Structures are given as structure tokens and as C-alpha cells.
Amino acid sequence: MGSNSFGRLFTVTTFGESHGPAIGCIIDGCPPGLEIAPEEFTHDLQRRATGKSRHTSARREADEIEILSGVYEGRTTGTPIGLLIRNTDQRSKDYTNIAQQFRPGHADYTYWQKYGIRDPRGGGRSSARETTMRVAAGVIAKKWLKQRYGVLVRGFLSQLGEIRPTGFDWDAVEDNPFFWPHAAQVPELETYMDALRKSGDSVGARVDVVAGGVPPGWGEPIYGKLDSELAAALMSINAVKGVEIGDGFASAAQKGTEHRDLITPEGFLSNHAGGILGGISTGQAVTASMVLKPTSSLRLPGATVDADGAVVDVITTGRHDPCVGIRATPIAEAMMALVLMDQALRHRAQCGDVGEVSPLIPGQADV
């Protein structure tokens, strides 16, 4: 079976290519009765969209959702939900000269080796255009989690190149095109990105995502660990090369007395574990980070070979993001929400008869 589906009880299957007529997804396992309307998808889809600032790809897609099934009179019916977005701003001619060339750092060569055929237009299925439908599915998961459990999922850009936030304010994240948590640094980011774009190069980034209000008990003890599924979900996003849960790799330099999250009746004293112990949520905020590599489609020449094995220099002239991490925040939020909703439904199915167990350690009031 092709790996285009995600989840166990709450499943999402995406389809479509970057320059095809449309992209879409089928969502199965959504509980009935959730109110949902096409306009509710707009906010997150526009957060992910290209062409919203000079710091992202110039491609401009309307990203208007069509609900094809699974919703009647504004409420989910419990049957598969079909969502579709039509592509309207493809420019496939940009890829004519490189259709037979393998871009270094891109999926061109691996797709060719796996399938023996590939769609070179905009990267085809390997394009981040596919993540549009993950964000759409995430809108449903976010709403259900918020209504049913009070869970709030949100993220921010925590590193762009070598620049890191020098302050933090959640309110600032939605007020700039970088999803940056410190408004005073936005001019510095703009200057950096303007120079990068002029040079024709690209840069990597880091995104942090946090889910507050997650109850204790979600996740499985071995193969369905909450952190392992969250890591896999974030790693499935285009260009992601590393994922951390909680303190992640910084744990290697910590001592046990520092890393362990001490417990009091009033709550945990820290959250180095990222809200997950033994693969199961603790009731604290679930925290994760992902690192995205620099965009590999560049205007600068790079050595490669073509489909005949001849040595060539490739130059990509299409519309591309100089930093894919800028638009990755809503994608990371969506993937965390999808994992959490799937885990919540699985927990309810197996352990719905388990009442509240004492003692119940309070989680963090704010994240």
C-alpha cells in the first residue's frame, strides 16, 4: 500500500501534485456532529500560503476549500470527509529546461530511482504544495480538540539561519510574516531575508510547536508512543531533517537531577520531557521542535547529472521559498493536531471506562 495515509482511527489521505489540476484529501473517522464551514479553513490556509510577503515564493493560489462529502447542513456526519482545492497558478514552463536533470538536495533523483518516472513540474508530489491539505485536515482536528478537551495547538519560528528570538510574546507570532515571537527583531529578519534573496541562496530554520491542555493518558506504551508518532508526523513534512521532543538533544548534556521533572501536588516543577513520559501524555504541555533544511531549488548553478548520466550544471528558475521554514509553522501545528486527535480517539476507545485517577497533577496553566 502506498504511504499516502496517516493515522489509525482518525485518518487523512492526501492526493495531488504541485502542478496538477487539484490537490485534496479524504478524512475518515471524524466524529459526527462537529460544526464546520468552508470559511473556517481560510485562516490557517492563508497562514501557510505563498505570495503573502516578499520573503516566500511568489506563487499565488486562492486555496479555496471545496467540501465534497461528509458534511451535511454544516455538521460532520461521521462519514468520510472529502476536501478539494483547485490549483490555479501553476507555471510549468519554468521546469522545461530541468525536466531531465536531478536537482541536488531535491527528491528528483530518489523519485526517479523508486518509480522509474516522475512529474518534474514544481516537484510533483514531493512539493510542499501537498501540505496544504494537511493544514486543511488540521483545521478540523484543532477545532475538535479545542471543543472536546480545551486543547490549544500553536507554533512559532524559533530560529532562522543563525538568528534566534531574544524575547517571547505569543501575541507577536500572528502579527508578522515570520511567525516570530519577538516583534522588535522583525526588521532584522527582513533585512537578512532581503539580502539572502538577492544572493540567490537559501537558509534553514527551526519551528517549535506546543499543545496546551492535553489531558494525561494519551499515547501507547510501546509502538504507539505519543512522542514516536509525533516525531514521525513532523519528520514527514517536506525538508524536515530533525525533530526534538521536549529538551530533545540537549538532554545529552544534562544530568538526571536536572532533566527529571520533579512533581508536587501543585504541579510539575519543569517540563524537560515535553509533556510525555513512557510514550503517554503527562498533562503538561506537549512540546516539539523540528529543523528544516535550506531550500534546494536555487538560482545559483550546481553540479549534477541528467537522466542520461551526463554531467550538467542545474539552475532552477521557478518560484521558490528562500526559507521553507517561514511557512512551516501552520504545517507543524496541523500535524501535531492530527496526531493528538488520533491518539485521543484511540484512548477513548480503549480506556473510556477508566475514570479520573488520583492524584491528578495539574498541568501548566499557560503555554
Curated annotation (Swiss-Prot):
Q: Which GO molecular function annotation, any one, does this entry have?
A: FMN binding
Recorded catalytic activity of this chain's protein: 5-O-(1-carboxyvinyl)-3-phosphoshikimate = chorismate + phosphate
Q: Which pathway features in its UniProt record?
A: Metabolic intermediate biosynthesis; chorismate biosynthesis; chorismate from D-erythrose 4-phosphate and phosphoenolpyruvate: step 7/7
What are the BP-aspect GO terms?
Answer: amino acid biosynthetic process; aromatic amino acid family biosynthetic process; chorismate biosynthetic process
Question: Can you tell which superkingdom this protein's organism belongs to?
Answer: Bacteria
Keyword annotations for this protein, in alphabetical order, are: Amino-acid biosynthesis, Aromatic amino acid biosynthesis, FAD, Flavoprotein, FMN, Lyase, NADP
Q: What is its EC number?
A: 4.2.3.5
Q: Which cofactor does it need?
A: FMNH2
GO CC: one term?
Answer: cytosol
Q: How is the cofactor bound?
A: Reduced FMN (FMNH(2)).
List the InterPro entries. Chorismate_synth, Chorismate_synth_AroC_sf, Chorismate_synthase_CS
Which Gene3D superfamilies does this chain map to?
A: Chorismate synthase AroC (3.60.150.10)
Positions binding FMN in this chain are 125-127, 238-239, 278, 293-297, 319
Amino-acid positions noted as binding NADP(+) in the UniProt annotation, renumbered to this chain: 48, 54
Concerning HAMAP family, the annotation shows: Chorismate_synth (MF_00300)
The record describes its quaternary structure and partners as: Homotetramer.
Q: What's this protein's family per the entry?
A: Belongs to the chorismate synthase family.
Its function, per the record, reads: This reaction introduces a second double bond into the aromatic ring system.
Q: What is this protein called?
A: Chorismate synthase
Q: Which organism is it from?
A: Xanthomonas campestris pv. campestris (strain B100)
Query: Gene that codes for this?
Result: aroC
